[in-house]
Amino acid sequence: MRQNCRSILPDAGNLRRLRSALKELQAEVIAVPAFTARHLWRGHAIHFRCFHPEAEGIRINVMSRMRGVAPFERLWKRRTTLVLPGNATVHVLSLPDLVAAKKTQRDKDWPVIRRLVEAHYFEHRRDPNRARIAFWLTELRTPEVIVEVARQHKRAWRRLASSRSLLAFALSADLESVNRELAKEETAERDEDRRYWSPLRKELETLRHPNRGK
């Protein structure tokens, strides 16, 4: 199933434009909660499925708040704009923000994070700058590449070593320890994601079964 994930500031104008686009796509809400600004502000995802013949079966997930991710206004300022065939433009999350959004309890997200950051490194390693080096040292999840970046950029490594425990083992190429710390990072993020979603899931259960317990 194809999916399209959207982040939106749920003010009146944006919601009006989104409703118009969803109507054109013949999209319908397929699960709780209902499509309201209140649910979006609360942090819920609204799930739609398209029934227009040219988009049939596409699922659209709309959110306004994501755990560990900056508020929408900052996401918008940092966005990446892509130009598609026909000169259409699409605004997408910057790579650092996408990586932050992917740090969930879902198994499928962690290999994606690893590939995204690794691909960015191999694309830009011959043209490093301060922001890129910091991004690599704080977000890479490939032990051998972490070692490579730490050794090539020792000044940045020294500056950032205290902010990420695995960097203490990078210069010595202690891959076993780097892997151990990566596992700890992932476990901590998964646990934090579960804590974040626990009250929201309870709200969803109440919406699904409003008469339960009465």
PLM region spans:
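Compositionally biased terminal segments of proteins
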Residues: 1-214
